[in-house]
Amino acid sequence: MLSSQANSQDTTTTTKTTGKLIEFLSAESYNIKKIDSQDFLVLVGHVKIKQGNTFLYGDSIIVNTTKNSLEGFGKVHINDADSVHTYADYLIYDGNTKKAKLRKHVKLTDGRGTLTTDSLDYDVSIKIGVYKKGGKLVRNKTILKSIEGVYYGITRDVLFRNKVSLIDPDNSIFTDTLEYNTYSQLANFISPSKIISGSRIIKTKNGNYNIGTKKGYLYERSSIDDSSYFFIADEMAIDDSLGLGEFRGNALYKSKDSLSFDLLANNIKANRKKDILLATELPILMIKQSKDTMYITADTLYSGRLTDLKRKMPKVRAKEEALKDSSLNKYFEAFHHVKIYSDSLQGVADSLFYGLADSTIRLHKNPILWANQNQITGDTIYMLLNNKKAEQLNILNNAMAISAVDSTDYFNQLKGNSIVVDFVDGKMHQMQTKGSAENIYFATDSEEKFIGVNHSNAQIITIDFKTDEPVKIVYTNQLTGKMTPLFELPKSELKLNNFKWLIDFKPLSKFDILSPKGK
């Protein structure tokens, strides 16, 4: 069987075949054999073989010169004159198709990533490798594993399938199908995927995340679940290196702290490092209460930390505690076409500021509030909350309260420099005005028939309410006024100066605050 033998050969031998030639370049020894009418070249020791631009190496290689194929053993190495190198303990190579079967301790490197498996089928001509019995790709500190995978050498993409995991120092990704590029480090999600980073869990079905730049784009209603918040939107763009995010299309932000608020919009931009939220395109802030929810909408809603405010808000409460709870270190601002709706209170204004530390909502520029049938206006209105329910209203400058009397065109009215309204269990309990106080009150008899109009002035006027209806009026200091029969007064004297009944601007439901009415 042994035709010839040579040691430390460096002679080139060319196989006789109609296909692309396999060239024997060097080996420590070789044998030529003929078995069943097939010719074999047995090469041993630092074997080097060439086919076109493809080089093959091994401890020993048997070349079937008849079929233009070979079998390699020990430290097998294939390189196609590029940066992709494959290694294995065992190789079967078809020189006609340039397809290789690598087995045992298989390794593929492309200069950036290293793929290891126990079985790899590799097409040298198109640089595609396939494994089906488990594989691992390592790129720096990033490790990817799956049961099946396909490596594309031209694009440097790897398609992982079946029990896929990607682990790096910052993220752990679990999915069924994942595409990863060893050069750009871009991971593409094409099946339901979970991305875990500390306490944060991202769920997506479609999108991508760059392990190197920490930037990602997620689609098809992806979500982010963290210890303090939950985000969901049709589309997301995130930058973990800067802590930034943009959420588009039916975006919802839900807080998980004791404040329990939700923010909805078609566009929300977030800065996690500075705790900033900017919502546009029909934004709605929902402040949850035990039995009621307050809805606030505007052209723009903004949230940030109180400690980052450059301007200081004037104190409203007589005693304000130091900011100890970090969850209270937050404020909301609303700009332009502000609307408020809850079961007990409704309102509109041009701008709003809500500081969580003092639980006060400040309404500016033509604010109007409605408490059942009572309309309240002033230059500025402060709404003091207790457990997120209205506890008190402070109406500053040009304060006026108006309520319709039944379904008539008559209105009870109260006017002064300022008005304070106290609530008990969400209902009006008392209203008091100070400074140039003036009121018009339509008195009725026991049968609810009008008996006259009381037009009075005093330094202080206090009105007590029961079930939102006035039951008692007290005038303090410098009282002047009189009761006049209704039919004796012209209509012009039935209304105080600057009277404006603005019921058409009142939001009637949580859906109504999204309508353009009142703009």
Language model features with spans:
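N-terminal amphipathic/hydrophobic interface segments
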Residues: 7-519
